[in-house]
UniProtKB/Swiss-Prot annotation:
GO terms for molecular function: cytochrome-c oxidase activity. It comes from Vanderwaltozyma polyspora (strain ATCC 22028 / DSM 70294 / BCRC 21397 / CBS 2163 / NBRC 10782 / NRRL Y-8283 / UCD 57-17) (Kluyveromyces polysporus). It is a multi-pass membrane protein. It comes from the Eukaryota. It catalyses: 4 Fe(II)-[cytochrome c] + O2 + 8 H(+)(in) = 4 Fe(III)-[cytochrome c] + 2 H2O + 4 H(+)(out). One of its GO terms (cellular component) is mitochondrial inner membrane. Keywords: Membrane, Mitochondrion, Mitochondrion inner membrane, Translocase, Transmembrane, Transmembrane helix. The gene is COX3. SUPFAM superfamilies: Cytochrome c oxidase subunit III-like. Its EC number is 7.1.1.9. Belongs to the cytochrome c oxidase subunit 3 family. This is Cytochrome c oxidase subunit 3.
Length: 270
């Protein structure tokens, strides 16, 4: 608050002028190195995974340090005014829109192949030789888990707004564990699948769609864990919890995307 009061003597607008930071360029180059190492490894130019693992470690490390600075600016320096929070919300909604468009392209690809399978696929869908994952097994359990997580995170959010910190923490902890269980179940499904991403168009589009959602769920689990840590350490209040609100929106969007994945990829596609 002192920082905000001192700054108001010299700054006549509510926006946050970010100090020079190395993290945007570091994250950009680390993502570039991750993409290059993945491409080279998948095409056989690199026989080991050490470059991929190193690039992934740099991406995660630089991302953690970047978000550490953002949390410090929001919690300790008072840089996130109402105008800044509004800008963050708009930016996050645009990010959600971009994610919806990415998944729309994957659904389009799936329908393109599934609704008119040619002779190379055996003129049927799933293609000849592919044993699809049964929708009444792990996918159904994952659907129930995600719907339950949406209920528990809403309970936690309302408890936080009402100032009930204990119930908010409990709901958030349950939500975090539900998402972790979802990730574990999805991993078990992948390891027990009878086909891989290399098995034609079906394997490619199936693992592209569900795998992208899986990666987002891993990110969501990390975001929920960070929100839980911040809530325990009194970083969030009933009127100022932008990070938690955006995480909740992210969770609900992924819930809806999973419902479409379950209906199309698992149920209709079988």
């Amino acid at each position: 608050m002192l920082n905000y009061m001192e700054r108001s003597k010299h700054q006549q607008f509510p926006f946050h002028l970010v100090n020079p930071s190395p993290w945007p360029i570091v994250v950009s180059f680390s993502l570039l190195s991750l993409a290059l190492s993945l491409g080279l490894t998948m095409h056989g130019y690199i026989g080991e995974m050490y470059l991929v693992n190193l690039a992934l470690l740099v991406v995660l490390g630089s991302g953690v340090l970047w978000f550490r600075d953002i949390i410090a600016e929001a919690t300790y320096l008072g840089d996130h005014t109402a105008a800044v929070r509004k800008g963050i919300n708009i930016g996050f909604l645009l990010f959600v829109l971009s994610e919806v468009l990415i998944f729309s392209a994957l659904f389009w690809s799936y329908f393109h192949s599934a609704m008119s399978p040619d002779v190379t696929l055996g003129a049927c869908w799933p293609p000849v030789g592919i044993t699809a994952v049964q929708p009444t097994e792990l996918p159904l359990l994952n659907t129930i888990i995600l719907l339950a997580s949406g209920a528990t995170v809403t309970y936690s959010h309302h408890a936080l707004i009402q100032g009930n910190r204990k119930n908010s923490l409990s709901g958030l902890l349950i939500t975090t564990w539900l998402i972790i269980i979802f990730v574990i179940c999805q991993y078990i499904e992948y390891t027990n699948a009878t086909f891989t991403i290399s098995d034609g168009v079906y394997g490619s589009v199936f693992f592209a769609g569900t795998g992208l959602h899986f990666l987002h769920m891993v990110m969501l689990a990390i975001m929920l864990a960070v929100c839980y840590w911040r809530l325990r350490n009194y970083h969030l209040t009933n009127s100022h919890h932008v990070g938690y609100e955006t995480t909740i929106i992210y969770l609900h969007v992924l819930d809806v995307i999973w419902l479409f994945l379950y209906i199309v990829f698992y149920w209709w596609g079988v």
